[in-house]
Amino acid sequence: MNSPALPHVTIFTDGACSGNPGPGGWGAILRFGDIEKELKGGEPHTTNNRMELLAAISALEALKRPALVDLTTDSQYVRQGITAWIHGWKRNGWRTADRKPVKNVDLWQRLDAALQPHQVRWHWIKGHDGHSENERADQLAREGVAMAKLMRTV
């Protein structure tokens, strides 16, 4: 018996930080056929790498059923971490090759869990290079930074 084909979803993500650490934001664009959804958020005290990770996590967690996902990021940290480094980290009990604890382990574990229902192909593009969806994700991330700055003043 053949299983039905997975729906195809395209995701573009970005993270931003005002200071590193400092207030940060993330943005994601999800596209399924003609349907598009924008997501964004922020945290008052964070790092750029955490926001890059949270953009991918939030986008994947927003999917309601298993999908074939093409996820594009401008973060080598995220792409390399999830396609190359994570396997060794898991084997080493979430420690790096030199036995130090993995930074942002909470988010790496959350990303690992968010991937499980899906088939994800990871793509990297150069940031701020005129790629329209990356520019839009960056704008959403900057809006997330603005939201995070407001959170700090409350």
Swiss-Prot record:
A Pfam family reported for this protein in Swiss-Prot or TrEMBL: RNase_H
Cellular localisation: Cytoplasm
Domain (RNase H type-1): residue spans on this chain: 5-146
Catalytic activity: Endonucleolytic cleavage to 5'-phosphomonoester
Residues passing through the membrane, by range: none
Binding site for Mg(2+) 2: D14, D138
Known function: Endonuclease that specifically degrades the RNA of RNA-DNA hybrids.
Name the UniProt record assigns to this protein: Ribonuclease H
Native species: Nitrobacter winogradskyi (strain ATCC 25391 / DSM 10237 / CIP 104748 / NCIMB 11846 / Nb-255)
